[in-house]
């Protein structure tokens, strides 16, 4: 069972790595093509206006591809965060244990202070009762 879990984690991490490389490569390739098209030094059989329109359309398509790759990268980051939040039980357990230990120590501290106040009040009340019952003005 543990081995299958480890293999699935490795496969998931490999797929994340593959997606990352593909998206970055797509962004880089499309950007390079946009820069190449912006130079406008292509000698073709088409008229200058036709070539300009074709280059403009290709730049728009490549810019859309860059945006798509960027959105894919943002989705990848979201998936990685979700994976870490849902599958990182060790650190979650550590956080829960440390916070519960902090709350227990705070509770014990408060309980000790309350017991000290109770003892002081009981001693003061005893002194007041003794003074009252021994007083000649009662």
From Swiss-Prot:
Pfam families in the record: Med22
Keywords carried by this UniProt record: Activator, Nucleus, Transcription, Transcription regulation
Cell compartment(s), UniProt: Nucleus
GO MF entries: transcription coregulator activity
Major localization listed first in the record, in broad terms: nucleus
GO cellular component: mediator complex
Entry superkingdom: Eukaryota
GO terms classed as biological process: regulation of transcription by RNA polymerase II
Family from the record: Belongs to the Mediator complex subunit 22 family.
Subunit (UniProt): Component of the Mediator complex.
Stated role: Component of the Mediator complex, a coactivator involved in the regulated transcription of nearly all RNA polymerase II-dependent genes. Mediator functions as a bridge to convey information from gene-specific regulatory proteins to the basal RNA polymerase II transcription machinery. Mediator is recruited to promoters by direct interactions with regulatory proteins and serves as a scaffold for the assembly of a functional preinitiation complex with RNA polymerase II and the general transcription factors.
Protein name (database record): Mediator of RNA polymerase II transcription subunit 22
Species of the source: Aedes aegypti
